[in-house]
């Protein structure tokens, strides 16, 4: 039961996603605040994974890295270079939504690291539609191939060096790239063909 008396939706994703978020370390002050908000909202929202379930809901995105660098697309409405991502389909897990959205928006086949999905960053932000997005960002591996976005999606999709990507993006995504860089540098995540030194620029 929520504070306003509504019954929470019994969703098996809630406890597992909450556990993943609780285990995720904050990379900076902004992410620390976002983590606090997401933890609280995952416990109290009626339907946190449903975009029609209330003004705040979970979204998922892909921080795509590979031998060509970092993959970004220029958002058609926001006119900013961002990571691919979006809303969850009914019953979909966030890590699966991140892959699906990325493939739909870039035309590239991407996948999680061999050891499984890696939650690399969490960010809470206001969306253009007036909703609040609880964005779960996963480190995703991309192929050595040029993007081929389908008609109807942003045609501005490109690989950038790590330095270029960091300079182009907002502070939240820059934080995600810093976290990804740390995971690669420490060997926590292996990106085939990419050395820690290559993530420096």
Q: What does each of the following model-derived ranges do?
A:
Residues 1-33, 37:
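Alpha-helical and coiled-coil interaction segments, frequently adjacent to or embedded
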Residues 22-61:
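Acidic, metal-coordinating catalytic segment for phosphate/diphosphate chemistry
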Residues 64, 139-141, 161:
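Short, well-ordered beta-strand micro-motif
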Residues 65-104, 163:
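Conserved Nudix-box catalytic region and its N-terminal flanking loop in Nudix hydrolases
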Residues 107-146:
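Active-site segment of metal-dependent pyrophosphate-handling enzymes
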Residues 148-179:
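NUDIX/MutT-family hydrolases
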Residues 172-201:
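Charged phosphate-binding loop/patch that engages nucleotide di/tri-phosphates or the phosphate backbone
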């Amino acid at each position: 039961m929520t504070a306003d008396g509504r019954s929470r939706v019994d969703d098996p994703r809630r406890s597992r996603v909450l556990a993943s978020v609780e285990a995720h370390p904050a990379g900076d002050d902004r992410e620390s605040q976002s983590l606090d908000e997401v933890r609280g909202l995952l416990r109290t929202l009626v339907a946190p994974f449903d975009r029609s379930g209330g003004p705040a809901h979970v979204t998922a995105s892909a921080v795509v890295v590979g031998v060509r660098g970092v993959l970004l697309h220029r958002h058609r409405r926001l006119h900013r270079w961002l990571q691919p991502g979006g809303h969850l389909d009914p019953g979909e897990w966030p890590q699966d939504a991140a892959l699906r959205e990325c493939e739909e928006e870039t035309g590239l086949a991407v996948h999680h690291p061999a050891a499984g999905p890696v939650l690399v960053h969490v960010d809470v932000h206001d969306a253009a539609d007036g909703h609040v997005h609880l964005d779960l960002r996963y480190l995703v591996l991309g192929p050595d191939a040029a993007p081929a976005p389908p008609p109807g999606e942003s045609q501005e999709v490109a690989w950038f060096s790590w330095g270029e990507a960091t300079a182009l993006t907002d502070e939240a995504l820059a934080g995600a790239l810093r976290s990804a860089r740390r995971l690669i540098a420490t060997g926590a995540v292996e990106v085939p063909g990419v050395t820690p030194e290559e993530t420096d620029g």
